[in-house]
Amino acid sequence: MAANAFVRARIDEDLKNQAADVLAGMGLTISDLVRITLTKVAREKALPFDLREPNQLTIQSIKNSEAGVDVHKAKDADDLFDKLGI
């Protein structure tokens, strides 16, 4: 695909410099990041990252789930409801 269009955005200069430094450490430029991000958005029809910040309860629940803490396994919904007593 030919790169023949330009994208411009106004951002804080300090933010731009900080991001450019981080990306340079990864071997990328800001243009590379924009190209990668827009390609993923076009292909997946969604943002390639989550804009929401989980609260502490959600973070702890995810950690517990990944560790297998308080995880209930069931063959179907009725079995799960029976195990949970509902």
From Swiss-Prot:
- Alphabetic keyword roster: DNA-binding, Repressor, Toxin-antitoxin system, Transcription, Transcription regulation
Single Gene Ontology BP annotation = DNA-templated transcription
Query: Which Gene3D superfamilies does the UniProt entry name for this protein?
Result: Met repressor-like
Gene Ontology terms for molecular function = cis-regulatory region sequence-specific DNA binding; toxic substance binding
- Source superkingdom: Bacteria
For this protein, the record's InterPro entries field holds:
Arc_rbn_hlx_hlx, DinJ, RelB/DinJ
What outcome is documented for mutating residue 8 to A in this protein? Does not bind to dinJ promoter
Homology family: Belongs to the RelB/DinJ antitoxin family.
Protein's job: Antitoxin component of a type II toxin-antitoxin (TA) system. A labile antitoxin that counteracts the effect of cognate toxin YafQ. The YafQ-DinJ heterotetramer binds the consensus sequence 5'-TTTGAGCTACA-3' in the dinJ promoter; DinJ also binds DNA but not as well as the YafQ-DinJ complex. Binding to the dinJ represses expression of the promoter.
Quaternary structure and interacting proteins, as annotated: Probably a dimer in solution, forms a heterotetramer with antitoxin DinJ, with 2 YafQ-DinJ dimers associated via the N-terminus of the DinJ antitoxins (YafQ-(DinJ)2-YafQ).
What's the protein called, per UniProt?
Antitoxin DinJ
Q: Which organism is it from?
A: Escherichia coli (strain B / BL21-DE3)
